[in-house]
Amino acid sequence: MIQLPQKHASTGTSIFAIMSGLAQQHGAINLSQGFPDFPIDEQLSTFLEEGVRLGFNQYAPMPGLPMLRQAIADDFKRRYAVDIDADNEITISPGATYGIYTAFTAILQPGDEAIVFEPAYDSYIPNIEMNGAKAVPIPLTAPDFTVDWNRVKAAITPRTKAIILNTPHNPTGTIWSKADWDTLAEIVRDTDITILSDEVYEQLVYDGAIHYSVLQHPELRERSFAIYSFGKAHNNTGWKMGYCIAPPTFTQAYRRLHQFTSFSVNTPAQYAIARHLSSGTASNVRAIMEAKRDHFLSLLKNTPFTIHKPAQGSYFQLATYESISDKGDLEFAQWLTQEHGVATIPVSAFYHNRHDDKIIRFCFAKKEETLERAIEQLSRL
């Protein structure tokens, strides 16, 4: 019998697949995995059909449709006042997770190190380790989940080749300030460290806050891959569409890998998003999600959960349950799904060592009736 190498077998099945499967098994309301349960913008559907009818059904150019890359450049000029070369700095990818893996593969060699802020999206560390490199986790400081910059300085060695960050942050909902970026720039100034900026929730910031992108920081932009997701901005996660913005030399390295993996990305979907971005009528996802966050926070007051800080960004809200149970967060999340019909994500899953502060993550990117049904269940605790 042929024995295949067990590449990254230690990670097992992701917590998102586990909890969504458990929700389906028990007929629970799924507030675990980060996806909306409401329709996409009707205009986006129309543009997708239009793309098919017009013949956008064959392979797209390897970097992505020129019309989409230009639409992205125009969008960033309008929203962030930055100039981006659509031909040499933007590459369309089959989702942001693919973009993160490809960027890490362009950066890392065996024996290198990459700094990860925890809690962290669960693909980061496997992506690093699958490239033969070592992940160096640094915990964010609770309860505000801020960066301890002294720990960052202490963690840097001659082998440090990358730092990955995520703002707005999954799962905590925090956002980086310009001061954070300035501090990071000072720390990496005389190094060969590359920054990987995961900005998939960049359009989801609340309470008048402003998302500050790495692309707006000239010094850091020169050493950064910035990763984005159409799924988060257009509520179409199943399309698996994202993009990477990086300096031309970084983009060349990224595309050398991309051409031999995915090569190209769903062509009619690229057409549809390009038309949607260029139409000037794209829905205000920020206002929609902020209203959902506020509604969910108001509803949560009728439950025994404790909210220490409303999410500043993303579509996730953390909550503690000290007045309900002393179970660990994984056991509690499983119990909540099986016995009370609401699926969440235990935050310990976002730590390499399963550090457990007894916090769970809710996704509020749901229809009002979905959130209200979930609260009805949770209010019985």
Predicted ranges, named:
Residues F56, Y254-H258, L277-S298, D326-G328:
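Structural signature of PLP-dependent enzymes
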Residues P5-G95, T102, H276-S279:
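N-terminal small-domain helix-loop-helix segment of the aminotransferase-like
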Residues D112, A133, D190-T194, R221-E222:
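A short helix->loop->beta-strand "cap" motif at the edges of active sites that frequently abuts
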Residues V136, L140-D207:
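Active-site phosphate-binding strand-loop segment of PLP-dependent enzymes
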